[in-house]
Amino acid sequence: MQNRSPMRVSACLLGLAFAAAVAAQTTEKVVIDGSTGVAPLVEALARAYREQNPGAAIEIGKGLGTKARIQALREGRIDVAMASHGLNIAEVTRQGMTVHEIGKVAVVFGVNAEATPGNLTESQVCRIYAGKITNWKELGGSDLAIVPLARPESEVDTEVVRAQIGCLQKLEFADAVKIMPKAPDMARALASTPGSVGMTSMTVVEQSNGRVKALSLEGIAPAHENVQTRSYRLTRDSFLVTAATPASATARFLAFVRSVAGEKVIVANGAVPVR
């Protein structure tokens, strides 16, 4: 039998190890679920990551509630939990998880592109949701009925606008206000319903291909620099929660999110990166 040199055997073993590592990288799947409000930004990041890493597998779920997402992460059913509010960072950390803040995004009053006003005052917002202003022509726009939309009271976008707009804090919405259960429901309704207005995020606006536009509030646009300087006050945080020591595939995705390339994706999708 022919003898094999130690160097040849070592090279063969190294080649096999490298092939195994590549195979593992192409088959490891990162499972992400949680806040549907954060999902559009994470979906954009996942698309960009896959373009750079064609073998990467990232699965984004259809949404989990505040407690359910952390429980799923703790039980190993998901690798990353998306969150925007209701997150007790100290408690999550105590349970052996790590919270990564990836961005801050403006909560906006988005309108269907057919609506013509570019700005609302806080008083006008409240009068719309109270049912006292019902046509855009009353605000200098076209003769088009206003279709007011809102998210459930437990959702972060509603929490933000009620907390930051004084006249909304205790306002009872008119019967005409339609409640959109999930963030994608709001995005679809704004894009497809003439005259509609509703609270959403700048990420949704940026991803709408011009079908949804964001209104300024009291003359202040929800622009990147205004979110950074906090002159635009309606904002919410975007968090990713992982195990304290995430699996290698998850760690690689997080590294991309924190990279210059990841930050460019965050900015392009209407959010402000947070290191």
Task: Give the residues covered by each predicted segment.
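Exported/periplasmic ABC-transporter solute-binding proteins
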Residues: 24-275
